[in-house]
């Protein structure tokens, strides 16, 4: 009992440490790319080196760095070309911020869900009862089939004999003697 009590406070102590105040990995990557003067962009190794210089532990968070780069490429805020990453000249960020249109759609959907919810529950109960009754008989048949089929399949396998290896004729030795 003493070991379990000692483990639980440790877990509680770690949780506040995980909350980081500061830029995210993707923000750090974007900052590194904007700061670099390389025209061709930054390689993955150069990016990691830059992040390490900014105080980010790249060795521990290797997966996070890779996922952040993939997300940035998917968002088209970063362009990948021949193993190098560049900042996109025309990032499509302003198009996505449309909060006014989303709100009325959500309200309409909620109303529709409330109306449809009651009939769905009734039909689901009926279907479940039917499924339970039907499922019992096919299971028995399947078990019987499975038991019979392996016995039949095994008998011809035993009768097969292994292939005999053919002797290779060596033409190279004969030529060497001449």
Swiss-Prot record:
Keyword hit for Glycoprotein: no
Subcellular location: Nucleus; Chromosome
SUPFAM superfamilies (alphabetical): Winged helix' DNA-binding domain
One MF term in the entry's GO annotations: DNA binding
Domain H15 residues, every copy: 21-89
GO CC field: nucleosome; nucleus
Primary location group: nucleus
InterPro entries: H1/H5 (IPR005819), Histone_H1/H5_H15 (IPR005818), WH-like_DNA-bd_sf (IPR036388), WH_DNA-bd_sf (IPR036390)
One of the GO BP terms on file: chromosome condensation
PROSITE patterns found in the cross-reference section: H15
Known function: Replaces histones in the chromatin of sperm during the haploid phase of spermatogenesis. Compacts sperm DNA into a highly condensed, stable and inactive complex.
Keywords associated with the record: Chromosome, Developmental protein, Differentiation, DNA condensation, DNA-binding, Nucleosome core, Nucleus, Spermatogenesis
Region (Disordered): 1-27, 77-178
Protein name as annotated: Protamine-like protein
């Amino acid at each position: 009992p003493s070991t379990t009590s000692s483990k639980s406070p440790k877990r509680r102590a770690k949780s506040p440490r995980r909350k980081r105040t500061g830029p995210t990995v993707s923000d750090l990557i974007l900052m590194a790319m904007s700061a670099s003067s390389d025209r061709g962009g930054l390689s993955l190794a150069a990016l990691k080196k830059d992040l390490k210089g900014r105080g980010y532990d790249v060795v521990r968070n290797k997966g996070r760095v890779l996922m952040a780069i993939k997300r940035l490429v998917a968002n088209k805020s970063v362009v990948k070309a021949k193993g190098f990453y560049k900042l996109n000249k025309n990032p499509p960020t302003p198009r996505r911020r449309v909060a006014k249109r989303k709100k009325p759609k959500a309200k309409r959907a909620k109303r529709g869900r409330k109306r449809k919810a009651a009939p769905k529950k009734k039909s689901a109960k009926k279907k479940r009862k039917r499924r339970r009754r039907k499922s019992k008989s096919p299971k028995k048949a399947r078990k019987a089939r499975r038991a019979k089929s392996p016995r039949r399949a095994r008998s011809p396998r035993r009768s097969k004999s292994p292939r005999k290896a053919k002797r290779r004729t060596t033409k190279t030795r004969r030529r060497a003697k001449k």
